[in-house]
Amino acid sequence: MKTFAKWLGTLLFALSFLHLPVASAASGYTQTKYPIVLVHGFLGWDNIGPYDYWFGIADALRRDGAKVYVAQVTAANSTEVRGEQLLAYVKQVLAATGAKKVNLIGHSHGGPTVRYVASVAPGLVASATSVGGVNKGAPLADIIRGSVAPGSFPESVLASIVNGVGQTIGFLSGDRSTQVSTAALGSMTTAGAAKFNAAHPEGVPRTACGEGDYQVTGVYYFSWSGAQPMTNVLDPLDAPFGLLSLAFKGEKNDGLVGSCSSHLGRVIRDDYGMNHMDEINQVAGLVNLFETNPVTVYRQHANRLREMGL
């Protein structure tokens, strides 16, 4: 019994080291030419007190040289409204830093949000990266929209609940923007995403599950996503993601977004052993012990941008 306990302890100790973000070979590993701006998804935030949406990611990037800014846009609204808010924030970052461009990284609904800015103001954007982005819509949004008629009483009840959640998140994170969850829902349906993509096609694959153009009007496009809804028995979101993944009917997904829908520009990977929240190192770092740490993925991407002169 003692031998087994010793063996188990040694194994867990070794696994803990495998899970740690890989240290940089030298200072400056993440030091991009242009500032990095992180953009949250639906019902997201920048930080609530000491708790960050991008759990441990911004600090890890800053540690080796990156200038990182975390945007706060409306938790629940259309891609275009969130995009205009982000554009205003980008201009503030450029004014504060003296930089000519930024590197945008958006998660979930943040993916289309950063794409909006890259599309309408390409001169201000060096790169746009979508992480688990709803670039071609999400089945859950389609199911909700198909089950709840626009303008109906059930829609008003559901919208009030979701708007209330958004307002609470906004209050706790210092944002007073108006929440319009019906607009957010419309943006994340397949039809809504298709309409947005027609107006802002940059980087969007022309095939169902291919890659998009790597560079358009001077902006480089990237994407990655997970494809494992359940990754850590201690994560309280694993069970809900496992249930929601049934809506994909066998298609690879992260619990909320299909792998093919996440594609934009150069696809780094669409099959990480991560669920939708693992992609931002949530909840509180409870991610897959047997997959690359999400923080490491962001550090590697910052280094990729650095090596490209971005």
What annotation goes with each model-predicted range?
Residues 50, 139-144, 232-238:
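Short aromatic-enriched loop/helix-cap "lid" or pocket-rim segments at secondary-structure transitions
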